[in-house]
A protein has these predicted regions:
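N-terminal leader/targeting and pre-domain segments
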Residues: 1-21
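A structural signal for the main folded, soluble domain(s) of proteins
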Residues: 12, 37-44, 71, 92-95
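Local sequence-structure signature of Cys/Sec-based thiol-disulfide redox active-site neighborhoods
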Residues: 16-46
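Amphipathic alpha-helical interface surfaces
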Residues: 36-39, 65, 69, 100
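Short helix-capping segments at alpha-helix termini
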Residues: 48-50
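Thiol-based oxidoreductase modules, predominantly thioredoxin-like and allied folds used
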Residues: 52-66
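Structural micro-motif
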Residues: 73-86
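Non-catalytic, surface beta->alpha helical segment in thiol-disulfide oxidoreductase systems
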Residues: 86-109
Protein backbone atom coordinates (compact mmCIF):
# COMPACT_ATOMS: atom_id res chain seq x y z
CA UNK A 1 0.00 0.00 0.00
CA UNK A 2 1.29 3.44 -0.89
CA UNK A 3 0.23 5.70 1.95
CA UNK A 4 0.30 9.47 1.60
CA UNK A 5 1.70 10.90 4.81
CA UNK A 6 -0.66 13.30 6.59
CA UNK A 7 1.48 15.45 8.82
CA UNK A 8 0.21 19.03 8.57
CA UNK A 9 -3.08 20.79 9.08
CA UNK A 10 -2.60 22.58 5.76
CA UNK A 11 -3.13 19.27 3.96
CA UNK A 12 -6.72 19.06 5.21
CA UNK A 13 -8.04 21.75 2.85
CA UNK A 14 -6.44 19.92 -0.10
CA UNK A 15 -7.93 16.61 1.06
CA UNK A 16 -11.34 18.24 1.33
CA UNK A 17 -11.02 19.76 -2.16
CA UNK A 18 -9.73 16.52 -3.73
CA UNK A 19 -12.67 14.63 -2.23
CA UNK A 20 -14.93 16.25 -4.82
CA UNK A 21 -13.00 14.35 -7.53
CA UNK A 22 -12.42 11.06 -5.72
CA UNK A 23 -12.84 9.76 -2.18
CA UNK A 24 -10.11 10.44 0.35
CA UNK A 25 -9.40 7.94 3.13
CA UNK A 26 -7.60 8.86 6.34
CA UNK A 27 -6.24 6.17 8.65
CA UNK A 28 -5.34 7.47 12.10
CA UNK A 29 -2.75 5.19 13.70
CA UNK A 30 -1.38 5.04 17.23
CA UNK A 31 2.09 3.55 17.42
CA UNK A 32 1.37 2.73 21.09
CA UNK A 33 -1.72 0.60 20.50
CA UNK A 34 -1.71 -3.08 19.57
CA UNK A 35 -5.25 -2.85 18.14
CA UNK A 36 -4.09 -0.03 15.88
CA UNK A 37 -1.15 -2.14 14.71
CA UNK A 38 -3.52 -5.01 13.95
CA UNK A 39 -5.87 -2.73 11.98
CA UNK A 40 -2.92 -1.32 10.02
CA UNK A 41 -1.68 -4.82 9.23
CA UNK A 42 -5.11 -5.89 7.97
CA UNK A 43 -5.34 -2.85 5.70
CA UNK A 44 -1.85 -3.35 4.32
CA UNK A 45 -2.54 -7.01 3.49
CA UNK A 46 -5.78 -6.22 1.65
CA UNK A 47 -6.19 -5.36 -2.00
CA UNK A 48 -6.22 -1.58 -2.22
CA UNK A 49 -8.99 0.13 -4.22
CA UNK A 50 -7.58 2.41 -6.89
CA UNK A 51 -10.45 4.88 -6.83
CA UNK A 52 -9.35 6.67 -3.63
CA UNK A 53 -6.33 8.31 -2.03
CA UNK A 54 -5.17 6.78 1.27
CA UNK A 55 -3.60 8.98 3.94
CA UNK A 56 -1.68 7.76 6.97
CA UNK A 57 -1.69 9.87 10.13
CA UNK A 58 0.61 8.98 13.03
CA UNK A 59 -1.51 10.57 15.72
CA UNK A 60 1.18 10.28 18.38
CA UNK A 61 3.64 12.35 16.34
CA UNK A 62 0.97 14.65 14.88
CA UNK A 63 -1.72 14.92 17.56
CA UNK A 64 -2.63 18.48 16.54
CA UNK A 65 -3.34 17.24 13.01
CA UNK A 66 -5.52 14.47 14.43
CA UNK A 67 -7.46 17.04 16.45
CA UNK A 68 -7.86 19.19 13.33
CA UNK A 69 -9.22 16.18 11.39
CA UNK A 70 -11.84 15.62 14.10
CA UNK A 71 -12.85 19.28 14.02
CA UNK A 72 -12.78 19.74 10.24
CA UNK A 73 -14.80 16.62 9.46
CA UNK A 74 -16.94 16.61 12.63
CA UNK A 75 -15.97 13.17 13.88
CA UNK A 76 -15.24 12.02 17.40
CA UNK A 77 -11.53 11.23 17.81
CA UNK A 78 -10.74 7.53 18.13
CA UNK A 79 -7.65 5.41 17.67
CA UNK A 80 -7.27 3.59 15.45
CA UNK A 81 -9.78 5.24 13.16
CA UNK A 82 -10.57 5.29 9.46
CA UNK A 83 -12.43 8.22 7.90
CA UNK A 84 -13.79 8.40 4.34
CA UNK A 85 -14.25 11.88 2.87
CA UNK A 86 -16.48 12.46 -0.18
CA UNK A 87 -17.66 15.79 -1.55
CA UNK A 88 -16.02 17.64 1.33
CA UNK A 89 -17.70 15.67 4.11
CA UNK A 90 -17.08 12.61 6.23
CA UNK A 91 -19.40 9.89 4.96
CA UNK A 92 -17.96 7.07 7.05
CA UNK A 93 -15.84 6.61 10.12
CA UNK A 94 -15.03 3.47 12.01
CA UNK A 95 -12.60 2.39 14.67
CA UNK A 96 -10.85 -0.55 16.27
CA UNK A 97 -11.79 -4.06 15.07
CA UNK A 98 -14.46 -2.74 12.68
CA UNK A 99 -11.80 -1.30 10.35
CA UNK A 100 -11.70 -3.45 7.21
CA UNK A 101 -10.84 -2.74 3.59
CA UNK A 102 -14.15 -4.33 2.51
CA UNK A 103 -16.09 -1.77 4.56
CA UNK A 104 -13.94 1.08 3.28
CA UNK A 105 -14.37 -0.07 -0.31
CA UNK A 106 -18.15 -0.21 0.12
CA UNK A 107 -18.10 3.51 0.92
CA UNK A 108 -16.14 4.43 -2.20
CA UNK A 109 -18.90 3.74 -4.73
Amino acid sequence: MNWISLNSQEQLSAIKQQSFNKPQVIFKHSTRCSISSMALSRLERAEVPQNADFYFLDLIAFRSVSDAVAEEFQVHHESPQVIVIKNGECVYDESHYAITMDEIEAQLV
